[in-house]
């Protein structure tokens, strides 16, 4: 049985398998549209930011 999924960008139905090199996207175009949305911060993973993971000190703090 062939698994079919919808492209998260344009909702086109496609088969999930080696014949779909851009999966879960239907094309390179849809893949790049999604990447651009992440780069523009239109998409993000919800949650609090751990201050210990920040590369720079917050304003007013000193480097250790």
From Swiss-Prot:
Species, as recorded: Aeromonas hydrophila subsp. hydrophila (strain ATCC 7966 / DSM 30187 / BCRC 13018 / CCUG 14551 / JCM 1027 / KCTC 2358 / NCIMB 9240 / NCTC 8049)
Pfam families from the UniProt entry: YacG
Keywords, in A-Z order: Metal-binding, Zinc
InterPro entries in UniProt: DNA_gyrase_inhibitor_YacG, Znf_NHR/GATA
Subunit note: Interacts with GyrB.
Family of the protein in this entry: Belongs to the DNA gyrase inhibitor YacG family.
Protein name: DNA gyrase inhibitor YacG
Annotated cofactor note: Binds 1 zinc ion.
Gene Ontology MF, one: DNA topoisomerase type II (double strand cut, ATP-hydrolyzing) inhibitor activity
Binding site for Zn(2+): 7, 10, 26, 30
Cofactor: Zn(2+)
């Amino acid at each position: 049985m062939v698994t079919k999924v919808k492209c998260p960008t344009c909702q086109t139905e496609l088969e999930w398998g080696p014949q779909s090199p851009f999966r879960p996207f239907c094309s390179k175009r849809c893949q790049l549209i999604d990447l651009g949305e992440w780069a523009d911060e239109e998409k993000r993973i919800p949650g609090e930011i751990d201050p210990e993971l920040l590369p720079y000190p917050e304003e007013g703090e000193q480097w250790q």
